[in-house]
């Protein structure tokens, strides 16, 4: 086994794209490791990970073998009867084989197999030096990096994410003499652009992280992240509040700085009259600042900026940040004030001139459909239908507001504020906001009954219209986000415990569409309904998989196509509990056997069991047990207590096992055969009343 040495590779660049930086760092790291592995060079990875700052991408590995392992090869040659003539001299076949191997035939070895003895060429080739392999490995790694917009600079023909300024290639204490992207490898790196003068000569790779830290560079993104959180929290406590640190904002800031330093800033209290969501949006999205909240979660007039330098005059840095934010806040206040003057209801007039989709009419048309759906759904879930209609009629009006035009992410949120200002009931203003929930994967569903109704109605219209208009997603194309809408609808129904009949709701949604896209003879309501139902179930499959539900459990319930998604969920829970019972596997296998037997039956199976035709003790016992189980589970089925149903059915296992062990189903006597099939059908129907449990059979 060859010696291992630490390896350091650093590409020093101009400032790299913030959003692309994590992906570039990971791809560079993975590419180097893959190149070493492909060539059989042993690596001790330890806790190594991608290292990066806005000005560098680095790979630091604690141990890399100095050379490849020996390469052993074996090439089989001709058999002796072909290789040697009668005098034992080499034939042309053997001479050619030896020449191809590059040795004299007398140096060849011999081996035997079932056909006889033959010549073989065995060779041991020394492994290549890792230092000689690294330049090509790096070129491959760089070529495979996901660079969004490659740049060219100077007179060079090559391209990279940003111009490369320096290159560290240090293997042990030795520089690898190679050139990449127009720069020769060296041991010289650079510190912070403003806080460190001069180059840094590295004696060995192990010096890298500490040497850069001394030069005011935290090359580990995790270290920068921890420092930012620590400093931001401390600054917020100093202001008497707590910082809002969103993951997205934090990641952006981590990749903007090399030596983060928190700066506490403030703005005029008058701006707090603007909805805080707009101010937070401005701070986080536009400026990458961290808002400071009070104990009640309300925005204060303080915020925190992250400088890429420890300034001697922090107050001056704060003033600069405050100068930047002030005009943006002034714009937001202007938009808000102007919108209030117009009023939420008046904004809706413009929706009639905005096309929602060519076949589905204007946004105003969509609003009317959603309002009708909301009014129809509300009484089914205990919400006020009048308020549901009113909330739906106002829910899209803020799309015409100046605020949403500037901050699209505030749709619904802005509407809530404008509805409140207009004196609408709090239930309506909240529902206008909650109609958009869940806004993204992992987001909460709406909390209020009215918000849930609007969320369901909005998504139902979007899905019904999309499928009727032929907009079903294909591949990566989903311009109307039908996949997200399907999951949002399903989650809202299930997590709210709403026992709604989905096929009937789909029919209502389809019936309200424009005549041009309504189901017709060539593609009737039943076809569109089934297509959309299956689409929603397909989204649910991923939802349950994320929750750890086995695919077999999902398929067992899906086969029954429950009309209610909430009922679907209860069946999923019940089948999960049933699967843990010791009787589950045997009953699942039995039900599978029953299905296979009944599938082959020609003609009608009797609906009732004739007790006078029960000949065997095992079939008598099973018939009695099945009738008892049907009687015991009827009420539980009616109450949707599926756990109780399956627990009771599990007690049938002894009788089921005894029946299949001792009774011939396909008896010669047609009356006996028909009666036994009737017994199996009754048993199978009840075993499959909660889910197609045969899916649990391995």
UniProtKB/Swiss-Prot annotation:
Catalytic activity: tRNA(Gly) + glycine + ATP = glycyl-tRNA(Gly) + AMP + diphosphate
This enzyme's EC code(s): 6.1.1.14
Location, primary (coarse class): cytoplasm
Keyword set, alphabetical order: Aminoacyl-tRNA synthetase, ATP-binding, Cytoplasm, Ligase, Nucleotide-binding, Protein biosynthesis
GO cellular component: cytosol
Single annotated GO MF: ATP binding
The organism's place on the tree of life at top rank: Bacteria
Enzyme class, first EC level, given as a word: ligase
Gene Ontology biological process terms from the UniProt entry: arginyl-tRNA aminoacylation; glycyl-tRNA aminoacylation
Compartment list: Cytoplasm
UniProt family annotation: Belongs to the class-II aminoacyl-tRNA synthetase family.
Subunit structure of this chain's protein: Tetramer of two alpha and two beta subunits.
Protein name according to UniProt: Glycine--tRNA ligase beta subunit
Organism: Xanthomonas campestris pv. campestris (strain B100)
